[in-house]
From Swiss-Prot:
Taxonomic lineage from the root: Bacteria, Pseudomonadati, Pseudomonadota, Gammaproteobacteria, Enterobacterales
Name of a matching Pfam family: Abhydrolase_1
Pathway: Cofactor biosynthesis; biotin biosynthesis
The protein's Enzyme Commission number: 3.1.1.85
Protein name: Pimeloyl-[acyl-carrier protein] methyl ester esterase
InterPro entries: AB_hydrolase_1, AB_hydrolase_fold, BioH, Carboxylesterase_BioH
Source species, domain of life: Bacteria
Domain (AB hydrolase-1): residue spans on this chain: 15-242
UniProtKB keywords: Biotin biosynthesis, Cytoplasm, Hydrolase, Serine esterase
Main location: cytoplasm
Record's subunit section: Monomer.
Amino acid sequence: MNNIWWQTKGQGNVHLVLLHGWGLNAEVWRCIDEELSSHFTLHLVDLPGFGRSQGFGALSLADMAEAVLQQAPDKAIWLGWSLGGLVASQIALTHPERVQALVTVASSPCFSARDDWPGIKPDVLAGFQQQLSDDFQRTVERFLALQTMGTETARQDARALKKTVLALPMPEVDVLNGGLEILKTVDLRQPLQNVPMPFLRLYGYLDGLVPRKVVPMLDKLWPRSKSYIFAKAAHAPFISHPVEFCHLLVALKQRL
């Protein structure tokens, strides 16, 4: 049975949908869900094949976006972290009337490094894909450790991420591989130039997966969007800086 796991909580006239990153699930938001649900009607989602959304194989980005939309409110702020940022962006491109505002967190429209573009080296992503078939739990843990490296709270942030992964059944290897394939191949730099809704991009200065060099490049490419860098955060600013993170989202709501 292919069912997306979906939880709605809180009250507010503005809906906020949170989409997690690769290898994880919606439990990753528990550090901020109480605060956010006092300002928004909050929607927590396990992406297809992750967490409690079982019964899915590897999906393309477009199919993942369509699957998530099935249970979504008519209109919401869509916030996506890392891989989830690509899913939220895809929804903004294909169903702009459903997106009140787009927020991407530690996400890139093109995660893979190109000649003219900083990112994760393609051979690193290919290496992760290879290692998944050998020892996928260890590979996922390595990927999580990369996400918090360099921050003052790196150890406890990494522990929080690991706890999130271990709280629920691990995704199937083909689902994890499919997610890496999306990170390796998708490039939304040009399409996202024309999104009509407010667009907020949040980054960690110490992020080892989304280099801060992309921020001014995207400021130039997407002049209508706004960017913000958490000075002491890495790839998971909502875990290391929850108060500041929630404040930015409440401020966005007040501007709508």
